[in-house]
Amino acid sequence: MNDVSMDKQRYLIKASGVAAALFAGIAENGFSASYFSYALAAFLLFLFYDLYMSRPIDRSFLPDVRSAKWLFTGIVIFYGVLLISAFLHGTKGSVNTVLWQFNLTIPFFLMLFWRARYDIDKGFLCGMAAGALVNCIWAFVQFHADPNVPAMAGYAQQNHLGTGINLMWPFVLYMMYSTQDTKKKVMWAVLLVLMAGALYTSKSRGAGLALSGGLILTGITLIAALRGKFNLGLIFKGLAVIALVTAVCAGGFLYLSHDKKTGLDPERVGGERLMMLEASWEMWNDHKLTGVGPGKWGEYYYSPKYHPKDGHEKGHTMPHDMPMLFLTEDGIFGVAAYFAFLLLTYGYLYRAIRTSQNKALASAMMLSFLIFTLHGLVDTTIINKIPGRMYYMILGWYAGYIAYESYRQRRLI
């Protein structure tokens, strides 16, 4: 998208693919406390190389990303309302909480700029696949060491591993679908099986439920967006895949519930989650407009006024439910901003399914978004360090893809 010479352009494209692979692969694995710094280093090294090779810099260095305006609007509304809530509470801790949460969106803006400027798809997707493989191996090693302890790989908690795997499923499936090379299809299929195994080692029931629910909602979305464009055979294949995955996830949920000796009793299946939701509702009833304050849920939950009499679990900082967290901490305006963000993202991806030339990739992004959103109903997602950054990284990359596609279409007119 810039006016550098053809030779320089070829070097830049190759370098961008390698750097994107490193960025994606590193960003998926919390192998150290400063893991994301290494991912940023890969981006910055390429950026400096790009600046050097693109001299003299002109306006084309900054790509046209107007196609992502719905996503920009959603981010501004969501985090803007959270920040206003923090200022209204007047505590430094609340402001720092929101700023830290907004910090997780950095990969979105980096990848949007990067992908809108260069075609990094091959490198980025291969980096994601490599990161997924590392997560699988890491999880299997932990499971082998002690099968009774849920695997976490490099994540802070087993449910985060489930979230990370779920974010990557759709794109590994997309790569298997899009290639015509039989050997590559087998390779991607093997990776899918390994990811299924890693998901099992995490023992994350919420991840399984989110996966099956995401498939069902994505199927409904595709039928609505592409009505009249499906052939009967494709519909039956899609229904078969959804039915199979749903059956496997339901079986896994029942097995893990039995393994954890909770059964399907709603009072036990989620630990203290039901108590947390009830306590959160009481908190909101007492603080309807502005909530208890960002980052203050744990403080209020363990206070004598709101802590359940039968509660015994320690160290919780959220109710394992994203809408309820924002309702409790930020009031009615906070949860409204969260839903506005989700609706704008869904609308953006729905439009992409209808208008993009690559509908398979648009469907993969929609599936990843819906799985991530549904998982947020039973656990934390968008406020967690590694899963949150992964989600924004993938969303930013896809938004850059759409921006680049829009740019090329305008040039053909």
Show the residue positions of the predicted features:
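A conserved mid-to-late transmembrane alpha helix and its immediate loop/hinge
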Residues: 196, 281, 289, 312-349
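Membrane-interface micro-motifs in multi-pass membrane enzymes
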Residues: 30-39, 96-100, 153-168, 206-207, ...
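Long extracytoplasmic/lumenal interhelical loops at the membrane interface
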Residues: 266-275, 290-330
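Membrane helix-loop boundary segments at the extracytoplasmic
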Residues: 23-32, 327-330, 361-399
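Membrane-interface helix caps and helix-loop-helix hairpins in membrane proteins
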Residues: 30-31, 87-96, 148-154, 200-205, ...
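A membrane-periplasm/extracellular boundary helix in multi-pass inner-membrane enzymes
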Residues: 201, 219-269, 278-286, 294
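Alpha-helical transmembrane segments of multi-pass inner-membrane proteins
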Residues: 19-22, 42-45, 83, 102-110, ...
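Transmembrane signal-anchor hairpin modules in multi-pass inner-membrane enzymes, especially those
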Residues: 1-84, 106, 113-129, 175-186, ...
